[in-house]
Amino acid sequence: SGGQYKFGTTDVTRTICFSKPSQRIKDIFTYVLKGHIAVATSDLNKHDTGKKIDTRARRYLKKKNLDYAHGTGHGVGFFLNVHEGPQSISKLNKIKLKEGMILSNEPGFYKKNKFGIRIENLIYVKNIKNKICFENLTLAPIDKELINFDSLNTKEKSYLFEYHLKVYMTISKYLSKTQKKWLASFI
């Protein structure tokens, strides 16, 4: 989902499951999540492009001979087009990332006529000490019922905890007691 606002454009995707997910779906969701985290935590030099990051996002799926047929991310416009360049995270993109750019981070996997998985956040490109890194702009919880936590390393578990804590600390003040309790369950 997403929207156009006078002060910016949003784009976010979450996969949720309304029944008990199979182990296969949990495993694939976790590979996608690991790719998503790999992008979000990338520490790049100032000459790196979206192509290098795309490889990181696909790594865990490719180890299982799985992939997705779209770029990992696209540039996001400001009250114009949601998909806007020249920056993107894809196999073909050779544009150097620069501070101030906004991109999506949206690896996924799709099994035709069966299921689809995508985790999408918007990320802001920052330059810190001549390194490129990303700041998450999207604050929406990730369904923990779909995660195989045994497949996450300590860094990935820490990232997920910190992300959910930031989501809670940022938006809980706008929520009812019941909504806060639900949101706290992701931490």
Tell me what each language-model feature is.
Residues 1-187:
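Active-site neighborhoods and metal-handling regions in enzymes and metal-associated proteins
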